Amino acid sequence: MERDNEPGPATIIVTPKVDNEAALRHHTNLAQASRYRDESSDDDTIGPGRLRTPTEFDRQGSAARASWQQQISSRIPSIVKKGWAKTVTWVKGPQPPRIYTITPFFPKLQHAPIALLDRYAPRTIQRIALLAALYCLWLMSFSLLLWKSSVAAEIPGYGNPIRLSCTARYWEDGNACGVDGNLCRPFSNTSLAFRCPADCHKVQVSNPHAVGDQEIVYKPVVVGGPADQQTGFDLVDNAVYRGDSWICASAVHSGFISDFEGGCGVLQMTGEQPSFTGGTRSNIPSTPFSSYFPQSFGFLSGTKTQCKDLRWPALAPTLVFTILISLFTTNPAVHFWSIFVVLFFHVALVSDPPSNTTYYGLVSVAFGRFLPAAFCAWVVYRYAIKRSLTHLTAQVEKTILWVGAAWVGALNNYTFDRIPIQRLTPHDIKAQPGALPALIIIILAIICIALGQAWAFRVEGRMPKYLGIYGLFVLTLLIFMAIPGLNLRIHHYILGLIFLPGTSFQNRPSLVYQGLLLGLFVNGIARWGFAPILETPASLLKGAQLESLLPAVTILAISAKNITFGLGSLPVYDSKLDNTYDGISILVNDVERFRGFSDDAYHWDDSTVLGKNYTWTWNRHGIEDGKGEEDVLSEGFPEYFRFGYMAGSDSADYTKAGVWASDGSWMEMKPGPSK
């Protein structure tokens, strides 16, 4: 039978005995812990920081206020924001970036120098020994050629020649030689042993140089040539040159030395000459002058020695050295520093040395410029060049592209100097033939190269960084341009420093640009030093015309024997240059013959009234020597007069030359200044 209501077995629950004291402590700890839970509803927070329970009023006024960025963004049209976003994405480049590397053409051929070195000099010590031997061979050959070119050139009877630059001369421009030229003596009966460099025909004067009523510009300053009159000296071709002629260009013009090799010889001062011929000889043009000049010179026959400018023979050891370093070196530091050092000293001492009369002085200048140049080189190597040369094994391509371009830049005086731009100034670009088209071509080439390099930066994902760097460069240049009283001048060494960071890729175009810019930097520092990027107008002009106020000259009396000029009143204020002139200087045949000031009555013909209508009388040259009027007229030599104001000891622009003809007639000055 089933027993539905029958109770089951009893369940026994055993409750353990609890310690009331322990339980109390447990509950107390839990309560304390719960107080420090980091919740917004924590009611245990007291004081001013306690959160109040939100009310309906709070919920109605709690709309979030937009930030200023959001307010500006809301006002920008969506099409602009989309375009900006796409531009930013494009500038950042592909993801992941693609890093340029050069895969050599004909790798077996290009790796042959490295394989040869691995086979015969596998150990590091062996390679260091070979490198040291190469350094020693270059230094020895370079030093011997330099010694032969500079020291071993004594001229018997005259001693060691003085080293001249292509623009060396006796007579200075304007009134720099003083009244009657006394600061540029001697005029005659003295000789000078000299040495001239090669290729002086390429050196041209940038500012107009006055020769009577003519001007020489963009060609060598040579006045004279073979003369009809005898000088009393045994001169080469009886060629006589005016004292303001460039000595080395005149020596080439006379046929005394070769323009290709330069040379040594002896110059003889021949005093005053009545006139000077002209004409082109040995690719050097000469300007004639139809009147007298107190100082002249020629070149003594039989004094030419076998000394030569060995810049081309000295190129061979340095060129071979750089080629060997490039072919057999994969270490970027060894490659860069070896080539940089030898290029620098080759330019500074051989191919384009600065002007200095002794080689000891030349070496001193070279070392003085080398240390700061080396610091700049370290910066560009560390942040630009090292990236291009690291792991580059295309030895032949590296030699042709990088080293070849470096030589093109370092020999700037034979490569880019042929471009008809002497200085990047508005005056020169306007005045020099061919300068404007050349500048346009250069700018277009730079733009094309810059676009190509910008694309490479984008491909490598580095465009944003370099846009910032070059933006900073541009901003700095704009600030420099805005500084009053100074002019911005970008020298070619500065161009190298600015553009070198933009070549930090390992691709073939960048190797060419990098080598070229490094060569330009080396040439700029070794030849000219760290010329300032900001120059004063006076320093930038360097003998150019100032566009100053010119004297208003009148003829008061004139005859065949003398002439009297009215010079106006002094002092005179020049509002354009903000300068007050208290004196006047007069050049006769490009020699200062008078210098007078407003406070000195002694100098003027009419000393009774100071400051008013100054006059000055000049007697024709030769009258003081006892020659009669008929003798003076028969000689037929005109005289050329130029007038310029002075402020203290500083002269302003001179007028163009007025001509006092031998028959007593006067030809007025053309408008405009001269120098």
Sequence positions of predicted segments:
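Soluble extramembrane domains flanking the early transmembrane region of eukaryotic membrane proteins
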Residues: 2-3, 7-316, 632-639, 647-675
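Short hydrophobic alpha-helical membrane-embedded segments
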Residues: 109-112, 116, 292-296, 309-319, ...
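Interhelical loop segments of eukaryotic multi-pass membrane proteins
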Residues: 147-170, 338-345, 357-365, 389-396, ...
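Juxtamembrane/interfacial segments around transmembrane helices
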Residues: 184-188, 367-371, 493-502, 517-529, ...
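Hydrophobic alpha-helical transmembrane segments corresponding to the first two to three helices
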Residues: 293-430, 435-452
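Multi-pass membrane glycosyltransferase architecture that uses lipid-linked
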Residues: 319, 346-353, 511-543
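Generic detector of multi-pass transmembrane helix bundles and their immediately adjacent loops
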Residues: 385-532
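Extended, intrinsically disordered cytoplasmic tails
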Residues: 529, 533, 537-675
